[in-house]
Amino acid sequence: MGVTDVNIEINDVVGRLSYRCDILFRVIDIRMIDGHKTAVLYGEDFRLIADAPFHDLKKMDPREQDLITEEFRSKEEQSLDLFRQDIELLKYKQEYSVTNAYRDDYNYFQVPGKVLHLDGDPSYLRKCLDLYEKIGVPVKGVHCGETEMPQQIGPLIDKYRPNIIVLTGHDAYSKSKGAKADINAYRHSKYFVQAVREARSKSPHLDQLVIFAGACQSHFESLIHAGANFASSPSRVNIHALDPVYIVAKICFTGFKDSVNVWDVIRNTLTGDKGLGGIETKGVLRTGMPYKISEEE
């Protein structure tokens, strides 16, 4: 049930027939490759980039899109609910500590970490910023192509002075380009690695600047070795568009004296430990007092 070439245009939502249309993609470019009309595709829910010839594509109508996305939306809601429970538990823990086990009646305030989120996909960036806002994470979002991140990250760190950086977008491993150990076989992994190194040259300490880096199927080991605290993708699987938000938000709301257990961070993500991993990292939340309500309030 394919479609003819003339039926597919940029921004159309399509599926790949060779993969039984299991993932929705948006057409972001159309090129001639080896004499064949080929679409460059961005995953709608996964941070995956792919090329596909037109004869392998099927334009998905709204009903078909809804059938595929319904399961993803349900998983998103479940993950968000679990994450909110985690955040509430962290807040209770901080409150218990600062009030001396509720024996003292202190008015206090909390300062979560600031996040700088660089994203190669403007659509995903908007989705992530909406989720940051829902959770209450201070964030500056920047749309930046993956290949430009190594040049852009240094000046952006100087400008915004973040506690946490997210470097993400789209990626993919291509078996035809080399073995899984070869970083040149990946679409954008080497640029994520270079950007992590640039960021670490600004702030070498793993707990002074927390870094998440990677996208679908990214070269996990190289990203961690370059200095990322958390990265994708240990098993070279696809990761969900919103997974980076859950990871950094958990760090934002964990006290700076407490370490974040890696499993506690990834267990409620949409992808889990096959797509996400990292190293033990301290939180960045700080508590202050007194909090005084102004007369105008």
Describe the role of every protein-language-model region.
Residues 33-42:
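Short, solvent-exposed secondary-structure boundary/capping segments
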Residues 238-297:
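C-terminal functional extensions of proteins
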